[in-house]
Amino acid sequence: LSFQEADLLVAIGSRFDDRVTGKVADFAPHAKVVHIDIDPAEIGKIRHAEVPIVGDAKDVLQDFLPAFEEAAAKQAPDYTAWWERLNSLREAYPLGFDEPDDGLLSPQWVIQKIGEMGGPEAVYAAGVGQHQMWAAQFIKYERPGSWLNSGGAGTMGYSVPAAMGAKVAEP
């Protein structure tokens, strides 16, 4: 919803793949796009960029930081109405899933239980596919860095080395 109604998208290293956009022609139809990517071939390949910027994301964002800080210091936006709208939509359309009639476990239920058992201190890693979407929806992530996934990159085999790295970082 926030993408669909946005008037500006700042896309950093985004491929605008169909897992992010759905039907590209209908994605964020009113938004101007600032597309930052180190690979010039990616900019504008799927979604037109009004402001194409070729460069390393770290360098580009460091260059932008003073302007962002200046704008934020002038007037902090009031998001109260936006949060009220989002919360009303969450209430009207809660996440859920149908329990199977055949006595089998639903994968959404299993993932939800894994999240409950792991709790807020756990770090979760997901591979690519439907389980990645369910894990994003049915596990409650309460701290930064606790959800490791390859996003729209579609990298099969990501989850095992990501989980190993997480264990090394937080034994």
Spans of features found by a protein language model:
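Glycine-rich, acidic loop regions that bind phosphate or pyrophosphate groups
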Residues: L1-E84
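Active-site diphosphate/adenylate-binding microenvironment
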Residues: R85-E170
